[in-house]
Amino acid sequence: MSIMLPINNNFSLPQNSFYNTISGTYADYFSAWDKWEKQALPGEERDEAVSRLKECLINNSDELRLDRLNLSSLPDNLPAQITLLNVSYNQLTNLPELPVTLKKLYSASNKLSELPVLPPALESLQVQHNELENLPALPDSLLTMNISYNEIVSLPSLPQALKNLRATRNFLTELPAFSEGNNPVVREYFFDRNQISHIPESILNLRNECSIHISDNSLSSHAL
């Protein structure tokens, strides 16, 4: 018995079926990441970073951890679905555009001098031990922020939802205005070791349960 198969002159076997079925969906991502990997500086673990990026994308993971890889930069196109990004303890001087889904950003102990536009749903911003001189507008969703050990002179408006702020060892000369109103949020803010010379009267708007730490500043005897 013989079996006749239809002839398809346009058919050809893929050189790598896994790449075509899995990574074909993400070809633009993979191509950009592979190019970025080839531009690695000595000591950077970009091969490990790309491996984690691809795994994150293929598995649709909501967390991407690229910390402690001695990276000097990140690729421009991060996985769009992530809600947590950890790039702490690298050599980063800037960050690319961040996914709009991001809720937690950890980028401590780098060399950042500025931050990109922050995602609208961001809840936690941890960027202590950098070289930041200012901050972008803070999203209303922000709950916790650590900006200690930077070079920040002034703060943007603080979100009403912000519960915990650590701004120790910066160059702040004044505290932000506090407009508590009927907001039930119990706050704990740390402004120790700055250059603050007076306390705004708006601090009296805070609930009794709130704590403002301002030791080791330049407060005068008539600070309030």
Residue ranges of each PLM-predicted region?
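The feature captures the LRR N-terminal capping module
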Residues: S2-Y89, N94-E97, K103-S109, S113-V117, ...
